[in-house]
Amino acid sequence: MTEQQSPPEQMVTGEGAGERGGNYKITIYELENFQGRRCELSEELPNVVDKALEKVGSIQVESGPWLGFERQAFAGEQFVLEKGDYPRWDSWSNSHNSDSLMSLRPLQIDSPDHKIHLFENAGYTGRKMEIVDDDVPSLWAHGFQDRVASVRALNGTWVGYEYPGYRGRQHVFEKGEYRHWNEWDANQPLMQSVRRVRDQQWHQRGSFENS
Amino acid sequence: MIQRRRPSSGLWKIVVWDEPFFQGKRHEFTTDCYSTPERGFSTVRSFRIESGAWVGFEHCGFQGQQFVLERGEYPCWEAWSGSNAYHVDRMSSFRPITCAVHGRSQLLLFEQENFQGRRGELSDDCPSLPALGWGGSAVGSFLVCSGAWVCSQYPGYRGFQYLLESDTHAGEYKHVREWGSHAQTGQVQSIRRVQQ
């Protein structure tokens, strides 16, 4: 196989679009059920209005994952968008406050391994819970209650939720340190479930072996 | 330790309130509730699961939309409903899920009804079937080998939920009709194990 030479000026300049061998492709539609004006994206979009869409009414993720935001410039409530069809706003948002999705960006997938440390108090203090390669629909079942105030995402990409069973406001944890809940844009340290974000275009582990 | 007459009675406990945010009339249940109105609750608007996994239903008699409920606090309807399009702010019956074994769950899914067509096997959670290689956004039938599972219309466990149990009709869910009274299509894009 001959590798194509790519001139240095065309190299991706680390904006974090996850250019590590995978593709990102998403189609946003102005109306519900994949109707109306549409726009195909393969990189981040700070404001859907820039693409002449007034709003986002439905979404098809062809390869991802992506992260949507309630407001432009990647602000406000977060919505994890994994490969699949999202025909209406309530298929990605659990918040009755807002049906708005105004910006979106590719979501980094770090490694096939997943490890996260949750702490009861800010600054990585108080009781600690380690989760390795598993999803936890109720932190209560593991001795925690409803309070998580700081997080270390050691490997992988994770998403935490206010309520058990992956309900309520979502907060994404990309590999990194989150000393205080305001670093994940929460207004209170409330988290009752947490899960991994996985996709076979990045890592085959856990994929279907169809027969 | 006091020996209980019913050894299972400590395994499931739900505390319910008839107002949101744990307000109003309160009651504890450790077994099935076929109809909350018959127990003096016109509806349940907040609750706490103290032990075990439960399934709640929109209507009396375990009918209508299903809500899988694991340990934790559910102060308002958006904490248990995954679908805002069909707004359900109440729960009128509920029962324990007795077969949940989170770590040892196994499920077979089939492209067509009656266990026909392409087959896939799961023993771990799957927040997006398309992302993990299931071609398409629908499932025709399920065979639950062990544990309890919940599948959802949309990725990330959103939309209508369908509970699949290994101890209900031998774990066989041959047709959409058998998934629940609210099931209209075979659209399924995420599946996960229920945690006891």
Swiss-Prot record, chain A:
Residues 109-113 are annotated as: Connecting peptide. The lineage of its organism: Eukaryota, Metazoa, Chordata, Craniata, Vertebrata. Residues 24-63, 64-108, 114-155, 156-198 form the Beta/gamma crystallin 'Greek key' domain. PROSITE patterns: CRYSTALLIN_BETA_GAMMA. The keyword Repeat applies. Keywords: Eye lens protein, Repeat. It comes from Gallus gallus (Chicken). InterPro entries: Beta/Gamma-Crystallin, Beta/gamma_crystallin, G_crystallin-like. Belongs to the beta/gamma-crystallin family. This is Beta-crystallin B3. PANTHER family: BETA-CRYSTALLIN B3, BETA/GAMMA CRYSTALLIN. One of its GO terms (biological process) is lens development in camera-type eye. The gene is CRYBB3. Transmembrane segments: none annotated. Residues 1-21 are annotated as: Disordered. The keyword Kinase does not apply. GO terms for molecular function: structural constituent of eye lens. Homo/heterodimer, or complexes of higher-order. The structure of beta-crystallin oligomers seems to be stabilized through interactions between the N-terminal arms. Crystallins are the dominant structural components of the vertebrate eye lens. Residues 200-211 are annotated as: C-terminal arm. Residues 1-23 are annotated as: N-terminal arm. Has a two-domain beta-structure, folded into four very similar Greek key motifs.
Swiss-Prot record, chain B:
InterPro entries: Beta/Gamma-Crystallin, Beta/gamma_crystallin, G_crystallin-like. The keyword Metal-binding does not apply. Residues 12-51, 52-98, 105-146, 147-195 form the Beta/gamma crystallin 'Greek key' domain. GO terms for biological process: lens development in camera-type eye; visual perception. Residues 1-11 are annotated as: N-terminal arm. Residues 99-104 are annotated as: Connecting peptide. Keywords: Eye lens protein, Repeat. GO terms for molecular function: structural constituent of eye lens. Has a two-domain beta-structure, folded into four very similar Greek key motifs. Homo/heterodimer, or complexes of higher-order. The structure of beta-crystallin oligomers seems to be stabilized through interactions between the N-terminal arms. PANTHER family: BETA-CRYSTALLIN A4, BETA/GAMMA CRYSTALLIN. Belongs to the beta/gamma-crystallin family. Crystallins are the dominant structural components of the vertebrate eye lens. This is Beta-crystallin A4.
